A protein has these predicted regions:
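General small-molecule cofactor/ligand-binding pocket signal
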Residues: 96, 137-139, 204-208, 263
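N-terminal glycine-rich phosphate/pyrophosphate-binding loop and immediately adjacent elements
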Residues: 1-48, 204-212, 217-228
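Glycine-rich loop(s) and the adjacent beta-strand/alpha-helix scaffold that form part
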Residues: 46, 147, 156-238, 299
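Flavin-binding catalytic cores
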Residues: 204-206, 314-340
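FAD cofactor-binding and catalytic pocket of flavoenzymes
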Residues: 221-326
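Conserved redox-cofactor binding core of oxidoreductases
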Residues: 31-154, 160, 223-227, 235-236, ...
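Flavin (FAD/FMN) cofactor-binding core of flavoprotein oxidoreductases
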Residues: 219, 289, 332-351
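Cytochrome P450 core scaffold surrounding the K-helix E-X-X-R motif
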Residues: 24-31, 149, 292-294, 304-307
Length: 351
């Protein structure tokens, strides 16, 4: 399975709420590759405008935007948060108070989209405040088959609501925002994609664009599982799973700035009793070079696509993840982490 959020707000309705900005150097690399308007100078002011940062916002900058950015006070961190913090300090990693500041790396608190203890999704931040507008209609339970073209001009979409029949809705503009999985699927069913693959599925080719659905990427994570001593186990519905993280630059395999992150997990899901016996600490590659693809299996929009992640396919990704696991293992041997656990395992192997 490749889990996605099927709701207004998409995957922001089910994700970890973590609100980490992209690294400025990465945006500049996009601009250098030809993505006009995506340099750090272009993008960072937009982050400033959409955020309402409870800790670092100032009038006119990172304050008053539709999406709250909040950090758990350290005195309320979980046991694994505190253990990772203290172990990282003991190992000599620097502290980075504001993870979203453009420069630096190190130990930080995860910023999250939260207000008054409640998740704030893109639906909450953008759509709900506009719900009462006379010129806005919101319709859910919709399945988009394809975009409708007149010649090479977009004029609408073919869509089904609930169990009804497919219908065509026309409009001056179509904004395609179905996520990393279904946006390319809609394009391919619309005839935009690899001509040979589309023809094999009986889809009329509008534009031969082999890159559609290709170059898929995601961040691999490997976790050390912590069997926590009873007094360090997370308890209660409000026990947040993660607050503490550690970013660093591997300087391996051509990786970019701040390409790696180590994340504390106070629990891996609460048990029915409300007490979680296990926590974890994960290391993740945030600048992956491996590429996969999203591929249609049918022209039928009810049929799910195949998602080939190809994680760790690139040798530089394997190099950096091996280094990351070694770093994580060293942190786990330090007393702040070792002292709160009964056992530490990587998969089926003991530390």
């Amino acid at each position: 399975f490749y889990w996605r959020g099927k709701a207004l707000g998409g995957s922001s309705s089910v994700n970890a709420q973590i609100a980490i900005r992209g690294v400025p150097a990465a945006f500049d690399a996009w601009a250098e590759a030809g993505c006009e308007g995506w340099s750090a100078a272009d993008v960072m002011p937009l982050f400033d405008a959409i955020e309402d940062d409870a800790n670092y916002g100032t009038p006119g900058k990172r304050q008053g935007g539709p999406l709250p950015v909040w950090r758990m006070p350290e005195e309320n961190w979980g046991a694994v948060d505190r253990a990772l913090r203290d172990a990282a300090r003991q190992a000599g990693y620097p502290v980075k108070p504001d993870l979203n500041a453009p420069e630096g790396e190190g130990l930080s608190c995860n910023p999250i989209n939260l207000r008054h203890g409640l998740r704030v999704t893109t639906n909450d931040g953008y759509l709900e405040p506009a719900r009462g507008r006379a010129n806005l209609t919101i319709r859910g339970d919709a399945l988009v088959d394809r975009v409708i073209f007149e010649g090479r001009r977009t004029v609408g979409v073919r869509v089904r609501f609930g169990t009804g029949a497919f219908e065509e809705i026309k409009g001056r503009e179509v904004v395609l925002c179905a996520g990393a999985i279904h946006s390319p699927c809609i394009l391919m069913r619309s005839g935009i994609g690899d001509a040979e693959a589309l023809t094999a599925l009986g889809i009329a080719v509008l534009h031969d664009a082999p890159a559609v659905g290709r170059h898929f990427m995601d961040h691999p994570i490997l976790r050390a599982s912590l069997a926590l001593k009873p007094s360090f186990r997370a308890e209660g519905a409000d026990a947040r799973h993660t607050n503490c993280c550690l970013t660093y630059s591997s300087k391996l395999g051509g990786g970019g700035e701040r390409d790696m992150i180590i994340i504390a997990y106070n629990h891996r899901g609460l048990a029915e009793s409300g007490v979680a016996p296990n926590g974890g600490i994960g290391v993740a590659l945030y600048d992956a070079l491996s590429r996969g693809e999203v591929r249609l299996t049918s022209a039928d929009p009810d049929e799910q696509p195949v998602v080939e992640e190809n994680m760790l396919d690139h040798p530089a990704d394997r190099l950096r993840m091996r280094d990351g696991v070694r770093r994580l293992a060293k942190l786990c041997t330090l007393s702040p982490i070792a002292d709160i656990t009964e056992a530490i395992t990587f998969g089926e192997s003991a530390l």
